[in-house]
């Protein structure tokens, strides 16, 4: 190998992604009832709390709290033990009218003369490592977490017996990171390292109240999760890949699962989430350029969003 390249992804239950999805859902709701809505919606999520802020100009009425709770419930935050759940979290809105000074630069008499809401730099990027022209390290990172969410919802694997019922031990928050090795011709030659961290229930009960018993239970949980990632998740992901990518997996793969040892406390309770903090995950995983603008909660008059979509069909293959 000549060099290594790494990209990461985060799940739908990661705090920053929870915030992104709430902002996007509010945007969708405004546009559904008023396609000319101007929206810039930011969200903060933390222990038991959601804060909505931003600027909106629209003729639509949107039940902000209902939309936010719907998103949180769909993601899977529906248990009080998570310290952040759809039914009981408090929601505070500070959304207000869009600035007239900004609006005058956006809305024009002729639709084709519409202005941009701001300046900015936007980049498109493509490569031939995958069928969707995305970097392989990012594509695999996304796929790992997408499949992990499927497994969580199916609750037929990565489970334990709780009160006589088979239950998934997976919780919504997770992250992945994939490192690819390249040769001197910039071609991927092997999957070097996979790091996967997933939030989980406390599904092994310590033998007693001692520190040693708790540590033994933690080790047992970690070993179970590691085995399930290796024997359940990875085979399901690899089965979805084209043959040329499958051959990049070998017995030298370094697999790190929950490397801190335990991940029960997570989601917005474990780490405050904000809209727009995963811009590299949302684009090209560190390859290509990025102007710094986020996508979520913005209507198409915001060029951070619209010009990225315009650039997608015209990306040059590298």
What are these model-predicted stretches?
Residues 308-318:
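Residue-level detector of conserved catalytic or cofactor/ligand-binding positions
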Residues 1-40:
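N-terminal, positively charged regions that mediate nucleic acid binding
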Residues 58-72:
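Active-site-surrounding "flap" and adjacent substrate/cofactor-binding loops of secreted or lumenal enzymes
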Residues 6, 48, 76-265:
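Glycine-rich, mobile lid/loop segments that gate access to catalytic sites or pores
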Residues 10, 14-19, 115-130, 264-288, ...:
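Conserved phosphate/anionic-ligand binding catalytic regions in large, soluble enzymes, centered on
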Residues 40-58:
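Short, charge-patterned binding micro-sites
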Residues 296-307:
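Active-site pocket-shaping loop/turn-to-helix segments
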Residues 11, 55-60, 127-132, 199-206, ...:
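A generic structural motif
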